[in-house]
């Protein structure tokens, strides 16, 4: 389960095993990054260890500004939705959709259209998440 409390337990166990001898935590999403950061806070390591997540959750953006989370992966939802709608219409009209890659699902190569994602840091937060209207600046910078 991608729950913050589970991530905190896993991070606590990892810290107990590694001590302070590690550089980064690559979390599956921003919620689990938040759980891992709670473990880091308990050990006095928050802001000293690189922590990544994905989804650009509001809390993650606030942690990025605060210095406890290094980055998040942002997927521009408006662009994704527009592209998905365009492809759905094409498929409904039996028009071709050009795959830009393929994904091996273990049984076959599935044609895939990959969409560019953005690594969001303190330096580009305003130009990405805020500029797209995903989160308002006053909610992030409080």
Where are these regions (language model features)?
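Hinge/cleft segment of the Venus flytrap/periplasmic-binding protein
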Residues: 83-142
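Short, well-structured alpha-helical segments in soluble
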Residues: 5-21
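Hinge/beta->alpha junction and helix N-cap segments in small-molecule ligand-binding domains
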Residues: 1-10, 26-32, 55-58, 75-80
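Venus flytrap/periplasmic-binding-protein-like
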Residues: 26-30, 34-69
